[in-house]
Amino acid sequence: MIQLRSVSKKFKLFNQQNAIISVIENANLNISPGECVALVGASGSGKSTLMRMIYGNYLATSGSILVDGIDLTTAEPREILEVRKRKLGYVSQFLRVVPRVPTLKVVAEPLLSIGKPETESLEMAEELLEELNIPKKLWQLSPTTFSGGEQQRVNIARGFVYEFPALLLDEPTASLDKE
């Protein structure tokens, strides 16, 4: 399902005299359907960078990243978008959304983007928002007005509303309360 072959990532810091920082070197990883894999490491060790490369947000400096046989390092943007729609979900540490979009539509968007009927998509979004204790009175508001914990629960709902074959979770519970 997901294969990384000799993946490296370097960042060029233009505001630091073009310093080059090597974040990941020669990473190899094979994840089969049904497997659950955890990346463990210290802050700044490249875990989020690796997930962003797998999701196609960052381009690898070298190597190949295959998701269901599609190499994201050479794929066209439309191919990457199709992988994101149908194959690969992503719950990041922070929710990033358009401020004018109500929470209910933010959660339903992955379903709407693949053509699922709006009524069914919104019903599924409602179920998840209820399960994650987001008060109904907030559903028509933008999640940008929510607390950090509420935003993260919206982010989790959005990631789980569609059954992606693979789901990347980047510290999805970091801003949640113990309960």
Name these PLM-found stretches.
Residues 40-42:
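The feature captures the beta-strand-to-loop junction immediately N-terminal to the Walker
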Residues 55:
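Helix-to-loop junction immediately C-terminal to a conserved catalytic motif
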Residues 63-71:
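Conserved ABC transporter NBD signature motif
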Residues 71, 120-137:
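Conserved ABC ATPase "signature" region
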Residues 101-109:
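Short coil-to-helix segment of the ABC ATPase nucleotide-binding domain corresponding to the Q-loop/switch region
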Residues 142-146, 150:
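Conserved ABC ATPase signature
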Residues 167-170:
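Catalytic Walker B motif of ABC-type/P-loop ATPase nucleotide-binding domains
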